[in-house]
Amino acid sequence: MYKITKGLDLPISGAPNQVIETAAAAKTVAVIGPDFHGMKPTMLVKEGDKVKKGQIIFTDKKTEGVNYTAPASGTVIEINRGERRVFQSLVIRVEGDESETFTSYSGSELKSLERSKVVDNLVNSGLWTSFRTRPFSKVPEIASVPNSIFVTAIDTNPLAASPEVVLADQAEAFADGLTVLTRLTEGKVFLCKASGAKIPTTSDVTVEEFSGVHPAGLAGTHIHFLDPVNDKKTVWSINYQDVVAIGKLFVTGELSVERVISVAGPQVKKPRLVRTQVGVSLNDLLAGELSEGDNRVISGSVLSGRKAFGPFAYLGRYHNQVSVLLEGRERQMMHYLRAGVEKHSIMNVFLSKLTGKKSFDMTTTTNGSDRTMLPLGNFERVMPLDILPTQLLRALVVNDTEQAQKLGALELDDEDLALCTYSCSGKFEYGPILRDCLTLIEKEG
């Protein structure tokens, strides 16, 4: 077991009740462009077209052969693009239940499937996009083979759903999905779970337990300790709910888009787990669920999710939670003289440290303006990986890609630096800075 002692469990209020309720059927769903790093679509549908669930709606120009499929049947009502025609989202109004069918197999056949058949089924159904590579956190190329595969069946993000609860009634499909994954690599399939958690498994996978504070549940943490990557070595990671979808695909021949997510945060009236689907409209899902005020809806974690608004107001492809905070637009008079009873600080400069307050109604305020990055030891407190965080972050900020590679940038994804962003007195957003650096490294070598 790996015990993570450096990090932070964010003390935010609005934790969800770990009981699953079924949400109303989705009215609109979407595929969001920025969820897929470096993807450039070739559209196969246009506004007004009817589509079936599982039908290919676009392919990736940059990664030949990768298909993106419709998460529901209905009518394409929007294809949103931003500046320079950058793809933002494709929105489908849900109508009917028509769906494509794919190749199915018996449970006994899964252990001996040829790799090519597994790849074909995943690509045709669009579930190939469930995988993300490390380095670069992109959808893998069709011909690529990973050194190992990591199944993330632990979630230490603030306000997250418990994988143990979500998988309680999905044991068979999850086990089938794990068996399918073993056909994709000659290396190990690591099942990473919380210490003592009752997660279904099979004899063909390697089970590893992690405990302690966030980021104990991130794929980047698991990869760092179990099978570190470099510029010549690639591994893949996949979320536990996508493993369930893969298991169902290969046994039933149908594309499962079900997703159990946490709807939580200080502004949610009834924080809980809901059963919905990939790409669901968050405007519809949260109707009547929020307290009054200027709220920010976040698809994903409060630490590393994205603001869900306009063409992006839908559940992200890789997100298992929706978080809602109050916009922190109001500034307190002479805030620097206040005791900070209602504020959290990792540097223990507020009185809240002495009062023993367990959770805080956090907002989006940064409590100050942009300033110089200061090496105060904060980054070392929240970074459990065997890297030099202050030096790495400095290299990222000045765009020194060569030094960043030497200091471990290739091991990281945006979410791995979220706690560094939270603890930075200079208010730097290290996730986007890392992403720009990784894009440049991939382009220039």
From Swiss-Prot:
Its EC number(s): 7.2.1.1
InterPro entries: NqrA, NQRA_2nd, NqrA_C_domain, NQRA_N, Single_hybrid_motif
Keyword Ion transport: yes
EC class of the enzyme, as a word: translocase
GO biological process, one term: sodium ion transport
Annotated keywords: Ion transport, NAD, Sodium, Sodium transport, Translocase, Transport, Ubiquinone
Cited Pfam families: NQRA_2nd, NQRA_N, NQRA_SLBB
GO molecular function term, any single one: oxidoreductase activity, acting on NAD(P)H, quinone or similar compound as acceptor
SUPFAM superfamilies: Single hybrid motif (SSF51230)
Signal peptide location: none
Catalyzed reactions: a ubiquinone + n Na(+)(in) + NADH + H(+) = a ubiquinol + n Na(+)(out) + NAD(+)
Record function comment: NQR complex catalyzes the reduction of ubiquinone-1 to ubiquinol by two successive reactions, coupled with the transport of Na(+) ions from the cytoplasm to the periplasm. NqrA to NqrE are probably involved in the second step, the conversion of ubisemiquinone to ubiquinol.
Family indicated by similarity: Belongs to the NqrA family.
Record's subunit section: Composed of six subunits; NqrA, NqrB, NqrC, NqrD, NqrE and NqrF.
Protein name listed in UniProt: Na(+)-translocating NADH-quinone reductase subunit A
Species this chain originates from: Marinomonas sp. (strain MWYL1)
